[in-house]
Amino acid sequence: MSKTGVGCDLLLLAAFHPELAPLKAVLGEGMRARLGGRDVAARVVGIGLPMAAAGTAMQLVEMQPSAVVLLGTCGAYAGSGIAVGDVIAARRVRLVDYSVAQGVAQFPDPMSVVTDAHHASLQALVRAGARAADVATTLAVTVDDAAAALIARATSSHVEHLEAYGVAAACAARGIPFGAALGVANHVGARAREEWRAHHRTAAAAAVDAVLRCVDDLSSPLSRFPR
């Protein structure tokens, strides 16, 4: 813990409160407690890539964590072999734009568009039952089957999540180990919103369960927030 009493071992982040709700039973109303000998806190960063990036940057300064794990739900691309109800552990997070996938737009060459998850965090989540997967972060939910197929093919991504790249980039800028555990709530495409509404709560709870099974392995005392 930091000299100011702020720093935590593990910071769990999510786009909005329902994705953290299953943690109240173990972290309490203040969303902070000691679990397995670790100081664990949970905070909301906002919905969508811009809000999540800004919200994460603010929480890193305020909470000074040793490690971060993003929680939430995602959609699986057709052909990924990943099913609704699975939990994935992010291996790589990629910023994706449909126009780029179509070949009618380009990201500037110096622009960072890919961030790898922290290897130890990935392995801990896999041991806890999550499946390693590559995550595409789009600006909006993909609700067209052909568009979803093109994005998956062009980026070799397995799942789609709106906030992952924003959180990962903010962590990378601060040198904070990043991981993500996401419950699969839907297939990406025309039925995405309908399926998500039906499954998002159970999918979010499954992601939380995976993290709680490996809390000690997700927070490293050797990787403190730079001061």
Predicted segments — roles?
Residues 3-5, 35:
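Generic structural signal for beta-strand residues in well-ordered domains
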Residues 5-11, 40:
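Extreme N-terminal starter segment of soluble prokaryotic enzymes
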Residues 32-226:
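Glycine-rich phosphate- or other oxyanion-binding loops that anchor nucleotides, phosphorylated ligands
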